[in-house]
Amino acid sequence: MSLQMITVRNNTALIQPGFSLMNFDGQIFFFGQKGWPKRSCPTGVFHFDIKQNHLKLKPAVFSKDSCYLPPLRYPATCTFQGSSESEKQQYIIHGGKTPNNELSDKIYVMSVVCKNNKKVTFRCTERDLVGDVPEARYGHSLDVVYSRGKSMGVLFGGRSYMPSNQRTTEKWNSVADCLPHVFLVDFEFGCATSYILPELQDGLSFHVSIARNDTVYILGGHSLANNIRPANLYRIRVDLPLGSPAINCTVLPGGISVSSAILTQTNNDEFVIVGGYQLENQKRMVCNIVSLEDNKIEIQEMETPDWTPDIKHSKIWFGSNMGNGSVFLGIPGDNKQIVSEAFYFYMLKCTEDDVHEDQRTFTNSQTSTEDPGDSTPFEDSEEFCFSAEANSFDGDDEFDTYNEDDEDDESETGYWITCCPTCDVDINTWVPFYSTELNKPAMIYCSHGDGHWVHAKCMDLAERTLIHLSEGSNKYYCNEHVEIARALQTPKRTIPLRKPPMKSLHKKGSGKILTPAKKSFLRRLFD
């Protein structure tokens, strides 16, 4: 086993606990970013390109007939063999958390429709379910079993929000274990059936699941109701005759106590369990090798990797399976440093030789790691954009000239600035306020001095006023500079001078009226 540190060259902030990695014929793709996708990559799926220990995230391309795939963290994912050649390998995605902290109950199917040396084009379709539809959840597992030439999805575990009649303002985001029901999902006809097995008494989440032919093994997990990580090992076997499916569960010895572990396949019959937690605040540093032979499962400890001091002393870690016996791990950065990364990333190779594609069986584990604060609202929204331009990466030149630093630049300047002392617009919490907003906040230009941009919402502008100002050519001054602008532009009020009309200058004045006494005096004076 070898451990290598990985340097992320761009979009580091997108990689957060709960992401998933999908391996399509040796090419790895990242799914489940933090926040809503931005316009530079509206699909939210990135090519996970690692070369010489440097990771580069490149935007993936979807066909125009694809449905919208929101960024989902802590979903259940598994591979599925389609019937046609174009659907040779598919990924099934169910559940998960959106950036708005909502839980999804939808099923998405991702497949490759075009592949060349430059890029891979995906198609995403949404499947509707009827029957016993599983409730929205996260931290669960989804596997595909094959029996008698048929296939069926097996869904189990996870967490969901409290029922609506029990949710209060103080505990609105409180979660609980889902009922320990096993769901069989027919992806071809969109039917789901729920089964109650007496061996499964408590709900589990963040467990490990391994599918082999007609059998699914459930290992470990965390029970939120009892706050324990039972060392249980269940074997769920599914028989698919012409009639109704038959399902049974057996409790096996030899389980281990672990939650949020990552499972990777090293060869046709062996898997490696990496990471996870054995207590709430204690990571599980031991790795295990799982062997499957003749419908038997054996779990043994294996050589422990040479963990770095940063990994040993970190309180949490997270990651996902890269396929071919490799695991991608992340730990929080050192906040004590003046300039530090938010996360440090590593790649653990559990085998020296890559697994050949023909030897790879389509198995899955619940590889999303557990968030220490998953009972609280732990994620906020980012910029959201989805339009026809999401599928407009038609030319190779345009794909190659993608600005990889656009995500970081936009978060520091442009629409996400602090426009005034009372500005509360945050890239992580912003939601549209005006009807004209879609993927960024509305802004207006202040003409004071050299000019600067301010958010319309921070200026308390009504939508009608905002539209009027945007259509006209009038100058606008923000709340901070409006008084200064008035003092500079509005003259002081002065009393206007009253000028007599010109006609009055030529008008003959009225004669004076003399009293009889004055007339008598003047008469005597001149006499």
UniProtKB/Swiss-Prot annotation:
InterPro entries: Gal_Oxase/kelch_b-propeller, Kelch-typ_b-propeller, RAG2, RAG2_PHD, Znf_FYVE_PHD. Its main location: nucleus. Thymus. GO terms for cellular component: DNA recombinase complex; nucleus. GO terms for molecular function: chromatin binding; histone H3K4me3 reader activity; phosphatidylinositol binding; phosphatidylinositol-3,4,5-trisphosphate binding; phosphatidylinositol-3,4-bisphosphate binding; phosphatidylinositol-3,5-bisphosphate binding; phosphatidylinositol-4,5-bisphosphate binding; sequence-specific DNA binding. Residues 359-380 are annotated as: Disordered. Belongs to the RAG2 family. Residues 361-370 have a biased composition (Polar residues). A zinc finger (PHD-type) spans 416-484. GO terms for biological process: B cell differentiation; B cell homeostatic proliferation; B cell lineage commitment; defense response to bacterium; DN2 thymocyte differentiation; organ growth; positive regulation of organ growth; pre-B cell allelic exclusion. Keywords: Chromatin regulator, DNA recombination, Metal-binding, Nucleus, Zinc, Zinc-finger. This is V(D)J recombination-activating protein 2. Core component of the RAG complex, a multiprotein complex that mediates the DNA cleavage phase during V(D)J recombination. V(D)J recombination assembles a diverse repertoire of immunoglobulin and T-cell receptor genes in developing B and T-lymphocytes through rearrangement of different V (variable), in some cases D (diversity), and J (joining) gene segments.
